[in-house]
Amino acid sequence: MQAYFDQLDRVRYEGSKSSNPLAFRHYNPDELVLGKRMEEHLRFAACYWHTFCWNGADMFGVGAFNRPWQQPGEALALAKRKADVAFEFFHKLHVPFYCFHDVDVSPEGASLKEYINNFAQMVDVLAGKQEESGVKLLWGTANCFTNPRYGAGAATNPDPEVFSWAATQVVTAMEATHKLGGENYVLWGGREGYETLLNTDLRQEREQLGRFMQMVVEHKHKIGFQGTLLIEPKPQEPTKHQYDYDAATVYGFLKQFGLEKEIKLNIEANHATLAGHSFHHEIATAIALGLFGSVDANRGDAQLGWDTDQFPNSVEENALVMYEILKAGGFTTGGLNFDAKVRRQSTDKYDLFYGHIGAMDTMALALKIAARMIEDGELDKRIAQRYSGWNSELGQQILKGQMSLADLAKYAQEHNLSPVHQSGRQEQLENLVNHYLFDK
């Protein structure tokens, strides 16, 4: 079959002096960073949905792209053609992983039976493509938000029959992920929320969602899936308010239903923006709560109130993100999935490469800067100094539960405590970070 991207062999590393827009300037898969190959640190993945499913349509306009697999035709044949192009793209881009929703890779069909049969055929196709290319599945998931049946949610739907249909999709998608050797399974509650409280029973919907997640965990263990289950927080869009608002909110939900040891988080940069947080904040929070799993690497627009899903291009922002990830030991089953799309005006097929190449170079340079920060150790040293009082006898007694509130009040009076505020030195630390970013 003729190559779709016939003007490109493979994207290669040419170094920072290169002016070739179809070459990496910073991402060298084999370069050692802190003793490990860059490819193993970053674990890049390209997503199926934005890259091969979106046709350029938006709220105000029809599809703008001319993709051969999006033309009228037999649905399964078009899905197979899309898979051909997708794996050509993954290979030429040098990404070791990819991600998908069930209906990204397979026609949904007109019934559950058709859905299951179509998906089974496409899983066999994907398995063959993975074996040929060496590209692996980072994670799979089920799209339980696009079809009109999910207008009021999937797990939180007022109709238990819709809940059951969603369960069928998740069972099928998780088993497909398991068969394909996927390293994670993601749950994103696109419509698990509400438009108005006038027709919403918050307690009922929360209980439904909690039970659904418990069943997901049960099924994972039943089929022997060894990957990580991941929830992807998002505050709103398409609903007014979603129940997986941010990392801290999801932690409370998981604790309520006894799932905090079973499910981790897939943090998306643009979702952090929508929640009023920095990407850095959401990553650091997930790590602090013991829930960090994987990343959807993209960016939003602080001046817009919706998910723009642009490619990451801020080394400054992502250096601090990679610093947190490296401090936490790096990825295990997770990775950096580019949940990002070219702009509607970017109609040339090679724009798909430009977007991903820039994003991969951004994250590679961010990784190298973060590694310098780790090796230097100055930021960690400053934080350790700031909290050093908690290593004292008093601090340890408080943390170990050896002193009550009344004990502390007595201690403060007996020792005539008069603590003096110590400077947080924020400006100095910001200058230090700029040193890592901009000084060679």
Swiss-Prot record:
What are the GO MF terms of this UniProt record? magnesium ion binding; xylose isomerase activity
What does the entry give for GO biological process? D-xylose metabolic process
How, per the record, is the cofactor bound? Binds 2 magnesium ions per subunit.
Q: Give the main localization category.
A: cytoplasm
Which residues does the Swiss-Prot or TrEMBL record annotate as the active site?
Answer: 101, 104
**Class in the EC hierarchy, top level:** isomerase
Cofactor(s) the protein needs: Mg(2+)
Q: Where in the cell is it found?
A: Cytoplasm
InterPro entries for this protein? Xyl_isomerase-like_sf (IPR036237), Xylose_isom_bac (IPR013452), Xylose_isomerase (IPR001998)
What Gene3D superfamilies is this protein classified in? Divalent-metal-dependent TIM barrel enzymes
- This protein is called Xylose isomerase
Lineage here is: Bacteria, Pseudomonadati, Pseudomonadota, Gammaproteobacteria, Enterobacterales
